[in-house]
Amino acid sequence: MSNKPIADMIETIEHFAQTQPSYPVYNVLGQEHTYGDLKADSDSLAAVIDQLGLPEKSPVVVFGGQEYEMLATFVALTKSGHAYIPIDSHSALERVSAILEVAEPSLIIAISAFPLEQVSTPMINLAQVQEAFAQGNNYEITHPVKGDDNYYIIFTSGTTGKPKGVQISHDNLLSFTNWMITDKEFATPSRPQMLAQPPYSFDLSVMYWAPTLALGGTLFTLPSVITQDFKQLFAAIFSLPIAIWTSTPSFADMAMLSEYFNSEKMPGITHFYFDGEELTVKTAQKLRERFPNARIINAYGPTEATVALSAVAVTDEMLATLKRLPIGYTKADSPTFIIDEEGNKLPNGEQGEIIVSGPAVSKGYMKNPEKTAEAFFEFEGLPAYHTGDVGTMTDEGLLLYGGRMDFQIKFNGYRIELEDVSQNLNKSRFIESAVAVPRYNKDHKVQNLLAYVILKDGVREQFERDIDITKAIKEDLTDIMMSYMMPSKFLYRDSLPLTPNGKIDIKGLINEVNKR
């Protein structure tokens, strides 16, 4: 039986609270909370929020990790007509204060201890939230978030300048959710049993909670204290009865460090959903060997177009024949185009910027008309967004990814994709992980390419000097990389800096190299 689209997220959650009140919606390492609990707790908290007399539709910050109270608070806020701004409890203090400065929330709900002391915004802490749950207040839903109202606001991790708050409406969310639960590429089962690992402040989290709540399934969450400790992580993962794994490819790479991460130990896993960064052929091949019968979905899209706009099930033929995986068939309600530098549509097969339009495109950045005007526009009568990604559309309707426009450089007359260089470096038998970074001269021209490299275990001991390692890597890659793409300098590190979302912070490294 195929899944039906939903008309309203809260009505759908209410429906499951009536039809399957004792079915688990949230499982934190074995501690279960049911759909009945979620309704009762969110109703009771929504009643308390209404009594506070906050300005209508004003946004509320919710600070915490993967606790059940986070989800119940989100639902309570949606019922009471407020957008929520999730901030992960592991966020840097500067980031937290920068978000508060931009958002000016009417309330902070701190499920984890709030790290800033001097805050003028009213605050509710975990004990008060639990007290509100215990009151068991009834609640009549009269003014929920609906239509073009903001459902959530997620701040992207800008490495420089102030963070940008992407406003996602209820309509935007429905466009994404209904595509995901009805699309044949995802093939999402009803009552999905879903891993809930990415933090709520990262919009990849919407890829697990939205379809799960829309289809009456269960979220299995891993607190971040566990995901950051290999031993605990592996012990916990094997105990979770999950069928769908949703994460960045990097998190799957981390899981594959354990030889036990395979279909024999985890026979329940039937689907892998990837988004948030590029899924490489190497990672997908390794995963296919470990889970030969699982469906591996490569999805793509910016936060500004609600999580993802395209997806494809990776085939064995793709793994055998392609150097780079396609990023998917685009969703029907979101016309996606490739345009040239003048803004003209390009025919299939030609490379340009990926433009997405339609009902999933955000209304823009919160209180930032300048940045909104730069990125958002109207295209053929529909709201549209400049992704800043380079792509090509095939005649079959498959989108191919060509890297970030801001990670494209001109060097000695050649146009070079930094991501291409990084991918090729990662093919060396000596390299665990590597990224390429340009160094600019005073005329803003690329002077040379540098490689930041993490070596595989045991490699350093095989060589006397770094220069010998570099020579061996270059020889190793002679047949793979064009000479003009080969970095002139290799810097060896034990780790590479990550953004708050767990991606390698390439912009930060570029700034470091160029002392910006």
UniProtKB/Swiss-Prot annotation:
Q: GO terms for biological process?
A: lipoteichoic acid biosynthetic process
Does this entry carry the keyword Aminoacyl-tRNA synthetase? no
Q: Gene3D superfamilies of this UniProt entry?
A: 3.30.300.30, N-terminal domain of ligase-like (3.40.50.12780)
Q: What CDD domains does this protein's entry cite?
A: DltA (cd05945)
Q: Which UniProt keywords apply?
A: ATP-binding, Cytoplasm, Ligase, Nucleotide-binding
**Residues noted as binding D-alanine in the record, renumbered to the chain:** 203, 307, 503
Which stretches are transmembrane? none
Q: Give, as one word, the top-level EC class.
A: ligase
Q: Binding positions for ATP? A: 156-157, 298-303, 389, 401-404, 503
Q: Does the keyword Nucleotide-binding apply?
A: yes
**GO CC aspect terms:** cytoplasm
Q: Which domain of life is it from?
A: Bacteria
Reactions catalysed, as given in the entry: holo-[D-alanyl-carrier protein] + D-alanine + ATP = D-alanyl-[D-alanyl-carrier protein] + AMP + diphosphate
According to its UniProt entry, the function of this protein is described as:
Catalyzes the first step in the D-alanylation of lipoteichoic acid (LTA), the activation of D-alanine and its transfer onto the D-alanyl carrier protein (Dcp) DltC. In an ATP-dependent two-step reaction, forms a high energy D-alanyl-AMP intermediate, followed by transfer of the D-alanyl residue as a thiol ester to the phosphopantheinyl prosthetic group of the Dcp. D-alanylation of LTA plays an important role in modulating the properties of the cell wall in Gram-positive bacteria, influencing the net charge of the cell wall.
Identification of the protein by name: D-alanine--D-alanyl carrier protein ligase
Species this chain originates from: Streptococcus pneumoniae (strain ATCC 700669 / Spain 23F-1)
Q: Read off the lineage from the record.
A: Bacteria, Bacillati, Bacillota, Bacilli, Lactobacillales
Q: Name the gene behind this protein.
A: dltA
